[in-house]
Amino acid sequence: MLQVPELPDTDPEETAEWRDAFLALVATQGPERARHLLQELARLARSQRVGWQPGLNTPYVNTVGVQEQGVFPGDLAIEERLGSIIRWNALAMVVRANQAYGELGGHIASYASAADLFESGFNHFFRAREGLGAGQHRGDLVFFQPHSAPGVYARAFLEGRLSEQDLMHYRQELTAPTVGAHGLSSYPHPWLMPDFWQFPTGSMGIGPISSIYHARFMRYLTHRNLLDCAGRKVWGVFGDGEMDEPESTSALTLASREGLDNLVWVVNCNLQRLDGPVRGNGRIIDELERLFAGAGWNVIKLVWGSDWDGLFARDLTGALARALEGTVDGQMQTFAAKDGRFNRDNFFGQNPELAALAQGMTDEQIDRLKRGGHDLVKIHAAYAAASAHKGQPTVILAHTKKGYGMGTSGQGKMTTHSQKKLDGADLIEFRNRFNLPLTDEQATGLAFYKPAEDSAEMQYLRRHRQPLGGYLPRRETACEALPVPPITSYAQFALQADGKEMSTTMAFVRMLTGLLKDAMLGPRIVPIVADEARTFGMANLFKQIGIYSSVGQRYAPEDIGSVLAYREALDGQILEEGISEAGAIASWTAAATSYSVHGLAMLPFYIYYSMFGFQRVGDAIWAAADQRARGFLLGATSGRTTLGGEGLQHQDGTSHLVAATIPNCKAYDPAYAGEMAVIVDAGMREMVTEQRDVFYYVTLMNENYAQPDLPEGAAEGVLRGCYIFDSWRRLSDKRERPISSKNVTLLGSGAILTEVVKAAELLTAEGLEVTVLSVTSWSELARDGQACEQRALAGEAAPGVPWVTQQLAETRGPVIAATDYVRAVPESVRAFIPPGRRYLTLGTDGFGRSDTRAALREFFGVDAQSVAKAARFALQNGGA
């Protein structure tokens, strides 16, 4: 049992007088006056340095009292029957799949604990999109606990959106189409079910942080007068164990700071994670109450069901409240796993007062005492209170039993999370527990059950969803396409750079500044930074377009007279996320999926230190890809040697390797501003005009060097991954290419292309004929080559020739490839080098160092001398 320390009472008589006076105050002047006096006393205690502060925990009872819960607006009996049917179909779906194929997996216990939390939302609160017209509700955003996906499928089956064949192919996405069915993904995956799921939540922690930044982005849209999101909510149903993920709780203070009363979390506190109790020796609800209250959230505890109301009313001595306060979660889990007789003896049998409360109750009645998260009346009261609350985000801490209703096979068991098979007796017990109209044969045969279309249950289900906008989850894609301005309107300086020195980061910021001025596209651009705008030369945008702030700017900034003044504004356009890459990528995802979530296309540009992208928040980027995000990720200060002095933790040599693993990510490493202009133009057209489900990753460098004009006809090669770059066109003396019998081909990308060009000049001076290719995307070249291979393997008559093979066919000699990334990046195209050509790769494998660029490039062997040395080696050792 939990020991709660208390200060000794040195004067009980005086204490009683204070207590009586306070009770009289509440009775005569009401709770508002009582709260005011308590606040005054707390202020006085602080001023007198008493050393006391109010505790963040409230009694272990429901926040919404019986007198405040209102009248339940639904038909409780029908809703309970519907819930029981959905529970059964969810269970049958998982057990069927695992009886047929034991390796498929799935979860029964999570949805069993959350079913009523879901159903109350579906029947009364979760609003679907009515349409995109004026006055039409654009829908709530609902993040579903991933392990409860079977329950969502089971409800969609009753709604007629999924067939019995679909349910029979749970987790069989490849097999299902062969029999005309839709395979159901394991968890919410928009990529796999693009008309169904909106938000991927399968990776713990990603859903919670995403929900916060989606709620904030809705305020951003409203405050910038782009879309009125009033009346829309973001609901998130998450697990208590999931709250241990850093991403789950890292943005709690942002939600309260922004006053996001459009955000409601429901934390399913079933007290169990995969291996055992979440807090066996403590109480997770108390811990989460302190956490959320301290972070400034409105906390609603949903602990006990209606069956407990009479017990609390009769608890005149406080024995029940004290016993519950002293029971740790590990013991509470044991009570959930045991029957009524055990609970009578071990809980109510602790003392005579508790025993008296249970007198007259049967063991079955004790066994059926519901926790708050299983009582539809209490859930509705909590949801209604959360929906009405203003000024703060709300969290509902719902007490449930994991595996609720699974009886001795699963309820409260340590192993219940992985339970996916039940025997005949267990199935019949489940049927009986929920009064399902199934024969023994149907129950043991795992027959799906769907009431007749004209039944009271089906009519009720439809009648309650209709005023809420229809069924959900439902992912929409209807969105107006955006025109993209001509490339010359914002990037002419890059296309015709004429040898001017600048970094590609500087060039990008100049392009972005031009794009922001476009009347059509400009307002839809969302610049996002994680406290690095000044590093990237973007400070001029502070004054030009402002930094978004939900309260405007309540102070005069120190630099108010400067052209670079730090200007915050209610309608500011920049999302300045502070030192939070997790928050910044969540904001980027919210903007990059706005076309689907809100029916409004937005174009986010998130610029960051490239090392702190895929390496730091790769899981969030993967989830964004699953969600079919559209936008730009700009990995600035990229390259292991280009960043120079920052050293091991900051120098990126791997981001392009990771980016290549994401199927809908197009990754580019342009060396020159003209190349980048072509890439940005193509990306915008592909994402907001053609509306394709891709996003772009472009690396930018902070090294200043001469920028050549983009060669005529190079655009196709830039986009496909490489083109022949003739370095002689940049030479001031207009020399002709020398004629030689010795040939070598050099490939380079990013800032290392400048070293490759220098190497070409060194080799040319030695009498070699050198061709230089600028590689803008190793991953696009590799994918193109792999696609040709796949077509050939499939027996297609014209599988095509890989682009890199075509380009190299116009060159001769061994091929040397150099990058500022690990060698695995250029190695990805080895299979597509023309037969008989020697291929050597140079890269920056290993940890970074702090030094000058020249020293770093020499150390890693990617400077001009090293590239030239590799070329000589290849020629001397039989290179073709």
Give residue ranges: language-model regions.
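Residue-level marker for buried hydrophobic side chains located in beta-strands
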Residues: 236-237, 265, 528, 634, ...
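Glycine-rich phosphate/pyrophosphate-binding loops
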Residues: 130, 218-228, 593-613, 632, ...
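Cofactor-binding active-site loop characterized by glycine-rich and histidine/acidic residues
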Residues: 74-86, 90-100, 107-258, 281-282, ...
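N-terminal amphipathic, basic-rich helices that act as targeting or association modules
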Residues: 2-159, 163, 430, 502-518, ...
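Glycine- and acidic
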Residues: 4, 21-24, 71-79, 97-106, ...
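Thiamine diphosphate
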Residues: 176-200, 206, 220-231, 249-445, ...
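Non-catalytic terminal/interface segments that mediate subunit docking, oligomerization
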Residues: 72-90, 111, 129-134, 455-630, ...
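A structural-propensity feature for long, helix-poor, extended segments
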Residues: 236-239, 243, 619-640, 645
